[in-house]
Amino acid sequence: MRKWYTPVLLVVLVVFVAFAGWWGVRMATGPLDPASACETTALTSLSTGQVQVRVYNAGTVKGQATTVANQLKGAGFVIHSTSNTDDDYKGTTIVGASGDDPQMQLVASFFPGATVTTDHRQNGLVDVVVTDDLGQGFKADAATSIDVPSGHACLPV
């Protein structure tokens, strides 16, 4: 007589493995950080202390993100986080909401020659992605404030 629980156990195990695979793919392909809201604030100029930056290391040099984050912190920026990324980048890349976003422009002024890309994010954060090729490097004497022609900016809460 055949044992009835063997096929049932096999079906339960297959369902569990399928669910675990689906969940793993969903977690691996999801956003790095859940989008938090930003608050539109009226202002005529934006200073480094009002800008939150995430720094990612896409290169092979260990500690590159921390080094750049410390330079940004020294310039007055608020460092949201540092991390590594496996995404493929060439040179230093600044990622933010839009090209006319004052936060992005201020951060980009510290990295001459960096590539600036937009992803229409709604959280007010700016990402700096560094690789082994820092290009022209970090411009420590860049201006620490920028005029805001629109009169408002979306700052992270």
Predicted regions, residues:
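Perimembrane helix-loop junctions in membrane proteins
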Residues: 16, 27-34
